[in-house]
Amino acid sequence: MPETRLIDGRDMLPPEPLELALAELGRLAPGDELLLLLHCEPLPLYAILERDGYRYHAVLRADGSHEIRINKP
């Protein structure tokens, strides 16, 4: 059954959220989802996701934080 994993990086300083996200991507099984909550848009992460074939959807939330949902194909 697909699993959703959460990294709430809103209280972390860069590059910690990016490092945690990259480590977690290596653990995702096909169909799993990684949910990131961040105060800034992770532009370097987007390039990595596109290069490696991950699907993602990013939303700017009402509180100004960014919600990024990443799926392993």
Specify the residue positions occupied by each region the protein language model found.
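An N-terminal amphipathic alpha-helical segment
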Residues: M1-R27
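Short aromatic/hydrophobic contact patches that present stacked aromatics
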Residues: L6, L35, E67
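Residues that cap or initiate secondary-structure elements
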Residues: L13, P42-P44, A62-G64
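Sterically constrained small-residue positions within well-ordered secondary structures
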Residues: R27, A47, V59-R61
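Short, structured protein-protein interaction patches enriched in aromatics and acidic/basic residues
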Residues: L35-R55
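C-terminal edge-of-domain segments
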Residues: G53-P73
